[in-house]
């Protein structure tokens, strides 16, 4: 279902207007026919490049479908509707037999309460780049919802997805990881790794270069979703590094492409 008109826009390389509209798909189903049966709710509200955005918009939508739904050869609206139906069908098929065994135990009802939500928007992050920002929140019987920010970076000039290999030289992690650790320490106002651990960071994992980041005009914002490098209570962690800080392992061609 088409939900809202133009969301945002920017110029493409041919002087055209790259515009987005909001699409919505959703459904709620009860696990059984009982009035107080556990519920599964799916809600997808997603930015979609319009037809007026041409081939560039088509490439962006196709990449979003692949990244978020692992599908190819289907439009975004169709992928959304298909995902909603499959998620709800899978919920009933897999959870109903288990629920029937636990039906008499009301303390276990929450184990069967499911929800899956995606909200997305777009942001022009430099003259030639766009970030597609998908926020995913889901719970499959957990006490706490799982929350994720999943950015997808694009060139507005071509619609191409920006990959790690477009930005960084080979072996960049060995130089980036120490910078990320240093920035995290500065953010938390500590001087040692032990002090970071005392604050709930890096207790079970070493610092690493995350797959999630937002390409900006002068910076990259690296994103760690809840529980990735810190306790759940810390929430989403963002570390911002400038291109000047990363100049030893950033490809010059990438920096030029931002101009």
Predicted regions and their residues:
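Compositionally biased intrinsically disordered regions enriched in Thr/Gly
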Residues: 10-259
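Sec-dependent bacterial lipoprotein signal peptides
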Residues: 1-8
């Amino acid at each position: 279902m088409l939900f809202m008109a133009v969301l945002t826009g920017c110029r493409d390389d041919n002087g055209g207007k790259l515009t987005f509209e909001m699409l919505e798909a959703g459904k709620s189903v009860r696990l059984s026919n009982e009035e107080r049966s556990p519920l599964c709710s799916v809600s997808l509200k997603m930015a979609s490049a319009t037809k007026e955005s041409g081939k560039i918009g088509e490439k962006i939508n196709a990449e979003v479908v692949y990244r978020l739904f692992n599908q190819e050869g289907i439009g975004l609206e169709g992928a959304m509707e298909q995902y909603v139906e499959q998620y709800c069908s899978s919920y009933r098929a897999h959870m109903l037999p288990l629920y029937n065994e636990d039906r008499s135990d009301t303390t276990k009802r929450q184990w069967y309460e499911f929800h899956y939500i995606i909200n997305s928007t777009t942001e022009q992050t430099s003259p030639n780049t766009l970030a597609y920002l998908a926020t995913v929140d889901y719970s499959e019987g957990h006490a706490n919802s799982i929350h994720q920010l999943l950015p997808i970076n694009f060139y507005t000039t071509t619609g191409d997805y920006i990959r790690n290999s477009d930005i960084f030289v080979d072996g960049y992690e060995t130089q980036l990881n120490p910078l990320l650790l240093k920035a995290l320490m500065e953010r938390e106002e500590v001087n040692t790794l032990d002090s970071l651990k005392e604050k709930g960071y890096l207790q079970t994992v070493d610092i690493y270069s995350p797959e999630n980041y937002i390409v900006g005009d002068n910076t990259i914002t690296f994103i760690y979703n809840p529980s990735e490098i810190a306790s759940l209570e810390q929430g989403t962690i963002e570390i911002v590094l400038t291109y000047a800080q990363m100049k030893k392992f950033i490809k010059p061609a990438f920096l030029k492409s931002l101009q």
